[in-house]
Amino acid sequence: MAFRQALQLAACGLAGGSAAVLFSAVAVGKPRAGGDADTRTTEPLAWTGARPGHGVWDSNWDRREPLSLINLKKRNVEFGEDELASRLDHYKAKATRHIFLIRHSQYNVDGSMEKDRTLTPLGREQAELTGIRLASLGLKFNKIVHSSMTRAVETTDIISKHLPGVCRVSTDLLREGAPIEPDPPVSHWKPEAVQYYEDGARIEAAFRNYIHRADAKQEEDSYEIFICHANVIRYIVCRALQFPPEGWLRLSLNNGSITHLVIRPNGRVALRTLGDTGFMPPDKITRS
C-alpha cells in the first residue's frame, strides 16, 4: 500500500511538471521592451515550465524520467504494480553518455563572408593539438557532430584525421548565435532583439536534441564529440547543469578547448572539465 501511495505522489509530481513544459523554444531570449531598453520582462522562459525551486534539481529535465513516459491514466485500469515496475524498467536508461564539447580553433575574424572566415595557421595547429589530445584519451568515440559553419568544419577536418573511423555529422543547429540576453549585460556586444529570438530557439533546440540521458536501448556507455562555438557551448553547459542560462557569458572558452559533460542513467549531470587547453603550449592558446 505504501508503495502504491508513493508511486501516486511521484506520478502526480512528474505529470504536473511534464504538462507544464511547452516545446515553444522560440520564447527563449524574449525581446526586451523598447528594443535595447533595460526593462526586463518577468515572463518565464517557455522551456522552464514548472521548475522546482532555486537550487532544487529537476530530475525530469530532459523529459525522459521513466515514470513520466508511462500513460498514468491507464495505470490503474490496465496494469498493477508488478506491470508498472516492469514498464519503468523498460524505460530506464542503463548507459552513461560522455559529451565532449570542442570549441573551433582560431579563425580569420576579418572575413567579409562566413565562408571566408577560415582557420588561421595557428588555428590549424590548435586543431591538431586538440585532435592529438582526444586520441590520447584512448576512448572509443561513437561519432562527431559539428556545426556547419566554415571554422567548425575545418576544425573537424583536422581533428578527424586523429580519430579514423569515427563517423561525422554536420548540423545547422550548432551554428554560432546569440542564445539569450546575458546577465549582467555587456557594452561591447549587443545583438538585435530579433537575433536572440531566432538564435535562441535554434540553440535551445540543439540542447534538447543532443543533451539528454541515454536511450533505454543503449547498452554501453557512449563517447560523443560536438565541435561548435563558444556561445553554444556555454549555453549548453548552463542548461545541462540547471544554472541560470543568462549567465552563459560569465564563462570563457579558449579556441580548441575541450569541455566534458557526463550524463548518468538517472539523469544526473556532471561537468568533468570546462574549456581545457592544458595540452597546448602557452603560446598557442587564444580566445578569438
UniProtKB/Swiss-Prot annotation:
It is a single-pass membrane protein. Phosphorylated by the RIPK1/RIPK3 complex under necrotic conditions. This phosphorylation increases PGAM5 phosphatase activity. This is Serine/threonine-protein phosphatase PGAM5, mitochondrial. GO terms for biological process: necroptotic process; negative regulation of cold-induced thermogenesis; positive regulation of mitochondrial fission. The keyword Disulfide bond does not apply. GO terms for cellular component: mitochondrial inner membrane; mitochondrial outer membrane; mitochondrion. InterPro entries: His_Pase_superF_clade-1, His_PPase_superfam, Mito_Ser/Thr_phosphatase. The gene is Pgam5. Dimer. Forms a ternary complex with NFE2L2 and KEAP1. Interacts with BCL2L1 and MAP3K5. Upon TNF-induced necrosis, forms in complex with RIPK1, RIPK3 and MLKL; the formation of this complex leads to PGAM5 phosphorylation. Isoform 2, but not isoform 1, interacts with DNM1L; this interaction leads to DNM1L dephosphorylation and activation and eventually to mitochondria fragmentation. It is found in: Mitochondrion outer membrane; Mitochondrion inner membrane. It catalyses: O-phospho-L-seryl-[protein] + H2O = L-seryl-[protein] + phosphate; O-phospho-L-threonyl-[protein] + H2O = L-threonyl-[protein] + phosphate. The modification Phosphoserine is found at residue 86.
